């Protein structure tokens, strides 16, 4: 590959793929459970994405990048972790940034913020207890906002499986939170 096409690929990659870097980081954070591992996963995933960028026709850059990051996360976790242990240390910060982009904070009082933090903490703990396949589907749908078809594309399972995993994940969350409230 000559220098001109390499620069063109870089510019095209930056335009099409890099806008979804925050989504990739959020997914990696939920799958890995901590900032350090998520950064490693996203870095490796972006390198893989760039290396394969010219070889594919990409109709949905977001789903394409998330698929690569997901696969990188599974490979990375398989090499670097001996168990299914998920540590949660800084996902609250990531989720707060996501929430700040989506919502307004006009009528937030210290009391409602404290309640929301406690509720968010319970929800986060319940999500981390979900089996990885359920957690992944839930994060892709409810945090990343992907539709069923896109989730099926990212996870390489049928749409029916995505729907089933989401349903079961939500049932388990409701059950876990209800049990915690008692």
Enumerate the language-model features and the residues they cover.
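Helix-turn-helix DNA-binding module
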Residues: 5, 125-136, 140-161
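DNA-recognition helix of helix-turn-helix
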Residues: 70, 149, 155-179
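Residue-level preference for hydrophobic side chains embedded in well-ordered alpha helices
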Residues: 16, 20, 24, 45, ...
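Arg/Lys-rich amphipathic alpha helix in sigma70-family domain 2
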Residues: 67-89, 98-101, 116
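Structural recognition of an alpha-helix C-terminal capping motif at a helix-to-coil junction
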Residues: 40-47, 51, 59-71
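Acidic, proline/glycine-rich intrinsically disordered inter-domain spacer in sigma factors
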Residues: 3, 11, 93-128
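A short, charge-rich alpha-helical start-of-domain segment used by transcription regulators
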Residues: 1-26, 36-39
């Amino acid at each position: 590959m000559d220098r001109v096409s390499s620069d063109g690929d870089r510019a095209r990659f930056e335009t099409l793929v890099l806008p979804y870097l925050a989504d990739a980081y959020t997914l990696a954070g939920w799958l890995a459970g901590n900032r350090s591992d998520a950064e490693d996963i996203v870095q490796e995933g972006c390198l893989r994405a760039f290396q394969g960028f010219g070889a594919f026709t990409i109709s949905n850059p977001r789903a394409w990048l998330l698929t690569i990051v997901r696969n990188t996360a599974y490979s990375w976790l398989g090499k670097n972790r001996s168990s299914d242990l998920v540590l949660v240390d800084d996902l609250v910060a990531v989720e707060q940034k996501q929430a700040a982009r989506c919502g307004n904070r006009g009528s937030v009082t210290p009391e409602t913020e404290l309640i929301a933090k406690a509720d968010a903490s319970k929800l986060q703990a319940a999500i981390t207890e979900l089996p990885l396949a359920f957690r992944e589907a839930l994060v892709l749908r409810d945090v990343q906002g992907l539709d069923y078809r896109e989730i099926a594309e990212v996870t390489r399972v049928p749409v029916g499986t995505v729907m089933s995993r989401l349903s079961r994940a939500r049932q388990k969350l409701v059950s876990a939170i209800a049990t915690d409230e008692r």
